[in-house]
Amino acid sequence: TPNMERLAKKGMMFTQAYACNISSATRCSLITGANNTRHRVTNWTLEKNKATDRPSNTIELPDWNYNGVSQVTGTPNTFVGTSFVELLRQNGYHTIHCGKAHFGSIDTPGENPTHWGFEVNIAGHAAGGLATYLSEQNYGHTRDGKPYSLMAIPGLEDYWGTGIFATEALTQEAIKALDKAKKYNQPFYLYMAHYAIHVPVDKDMRFFPKYIKKGLSDKEAAYASLIEGMDK
């Protein structure tokens, strides 16, 4: 990931930090500043009031916050915290969210990035995964525009049927948002969270053939294409 490494060298790296192996927990920590022991989002979230734990006969499952996080009270099994993005907005920043959100379950306040202080939301909603990266499948929508999966990516209708991989569509939208932000007489903050490299392991055909030629298996080449598309 040479481009990610290049950005890191120009920015700030956190070398004494903990990232939970469940991505929901890490995102909730990023937005609220609370670690997963405190916010108690210890598994992935999706549907309101529904835990996603697998049944177990050997361990007692914890009572965790399966509705995610929020800035307001009133939703059970939810950690209430302050968003650093809201603090930025209150202090004059133009705030942009692009890509994966996954802060709160469906139909809770925290599911919408605007709840957290983002003035612009591009493709963020309750799900942390996605139905497909493929525009040929409308990123998880039927031809009449209805999502056929809870993980259908919203907000990318302009790219349906164009042949543009979801990762590239998000990158293009982020660049457009930054170009607009530069015209404003204020600082800006972009939270960029690609859906890649989450399953499904779809083939990004811009890069897939290259890895096949290098001798990788079909699945390995597809996974490598996701990584390069994210790093582009």
Task: Label each residue range with its predicted role.
Residues 46-94, 101-188, 194-203, 217:
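Formylglycine-dependent
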Residues 3-4, 10, 26-27, 80-84, ...:
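Stable alpha-helical elements in mature extracytoplasmic
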Residues 13, 20-25, 36-38, 101-105, ...:
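Solvent-exposed loop/turn segments at secondary-structure junctions
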